[in-house]
Amino acid sequence: MPAITASMVAELRAKTDAPMMECKKALTEAEGDLNKAEELLRVKLGSKASKAASRVTAEGIVVAHISGTTGALMELNCETDFVSKNDDFLAFGKTLAELVATKAPVDVAALSALEIAGVTVEATRTALIGKIGENIAIRRFKRFSGDSKLVSYLHGTRIGVVVEYTGDDVAAKDVAMHVAAMKPVALTSADVPADLIEKERNVAAGKAAEDAKAAEAAGKAPQSAEIVTKRVEGSVQKFLKEVSLFNQTFVKNDKQTVEQMLKAASTTIKGFTMYIVGEGIEKKTDDFAAEVAAQVAAAKGQ
């Protein structure tokens, strides 16, 4: 078998983008045959991707791409915070956001079929999984286009906001920053989803019921049904004010609401979208004690 030289390893790495040690192992296994080593690596990287596919991806990045009145916001997930800072992972996310903005895929499947430098997004993702050793998932994206101006704000790589607006650019940027900080769920109270309102109403009613039980236990008269109804409705209205953008106190000036700030700046917000990394994904937690106990039990044949 010919000696495995540094130049052979470098050439294989350039072709496959695999780690140096993986390239050396493949060349050794292929007895110096570069083509065979490349084939072995392709299989190995694909195998790594298959094994990683079932693992939870609750970390990652949010990326925005804005070009005039066209833009995109997307979330790319991985398994650990460490990988979310990897240069290749970050570059992949940036490229995907640009693809969404320029090619307008309708869903993740359509995005995965697009090409990056002659290679499909899916093949690129699979190769990156093999290189990094973690599952990588394109979770979601939204494309923006139309007559409205666009502005984005990124809080690191974990929170991303895109605001659609007409009017003052500085005011719109401030709103994007405000959204990231205060996390409204809708523009106005009327836009808040009915299920969130119902949930808040149930919570308020539950608190009132607990107070009634406590009053009875203390030998006091509980609040009347009329007072309870007003109390519940008051809680709901307070909630609506807290979660609707226009009603929120402006984060940079607590003397005015966002709506008042926008009016003074002659600016209209048409909509906003916010992504938070891992939002709604149940993260896996490792129970070390339980794992050790299971291993001991297995060793005892239990």
From Swiss-Prot:
Pfam families: EF_TS
GO CC terms: cytoplasm
InterPro entries per UniProt: EF-Ts_dimer_sf, Transl_elong_EFTs/EF1B, Transl_elong_EFTs/EF1B_dimer, Transl_elong_Ts_CS, UBA-like_sf
Annotated region (Involved in Mg(2+) ion dislocation from EF-Tu), positions in chain: 80-83
Compartmental location: Cytoplasm
CDD domains xref list: UBA_EF-Ts
Keyword list, A-Z: Cytoplasm, Elongation factor, Protein biosynthesis
Protein name as annotated: Elongation factor Ts
Organism: Methylibium petroleiphilum (strain ATCC BAA-1232 / LMG 22953 / PM1)
